[in-house]
Amino acid sequence: MTMSDPIADFLTRIRNANMVRHETVETPASKIKINIAQILKDEGFITDYQVVDTPNKQGLISLSLKYGPNRERIITGLKRISKPGLRSYVQADSVPKVLNGLGIAILSTSEGVMTDKAARAKMIGGEVIAYVW
């Protein structure tokens, strides 16, 4: 059976692993998931990620989650915004800020997947994929 929203599944796997303080989490790979993982790494929400080849064509992404010195969570929240049944698009002048700039919004734009800060700097809008804080 096919999955109706693979990005929501990706975010849910990260959220669940983070809640029980797992060191790593594996999820099926895709280009957009790799781009989201790169953004999470660049913004300091995860330590690293690796794309693991498997016998099937798809492969896996292995994410190394990041925690504070006393095992406190770095990712306190993940929320899927644009869903298959209700897409959410924003124009360049209305790109959202998450928690007044403490979190990030991940957008899919005509120039690729990027954070809200990068989209504001380039003055482009797009589809709001998720909020991370």
Curated annotation (Swiss-Prot):
Family matches, as PANTHER family: 40S RIBOSOMAL PROTEIN S15A (PTHR11758)
TM annotation in the entry: none
GO cellular-component term (any): ribosome
Protein role: One of the primary rRNA binding proteins, it binds directly to 16S rRNA central domain where it helps coordinate assembly of the platform of the 30S subunit.
Keyword Coiled coil: no
Any GO molecular function: structural constituent of ribosome
Subunit-structure text: Part of the 30S ribosomal subunit. Contacts proteins S5 and S12.
This protein's UniProt keywords: Ribonucleoprotein, Ribosomal protein, RNA-binding, rRNA-binding
One example of a Gene Ontology biological process annotation: translation
Family (UniProt): Belongs to the universal ribosomal protein uS8 family.
Pfam families: Ribosomal_S8
Coiled coil ranges: none
Protein's UniProt name: Small ribosomal subunit protein uS8
Database matches in SUPFAM superfamilies: Ribosomal protein S8
Alphabetical list of InterPro entries matching this protein: Ribosomal_uS8, Ribosomal_uS8_CS, Ribosomal_uS8_sf
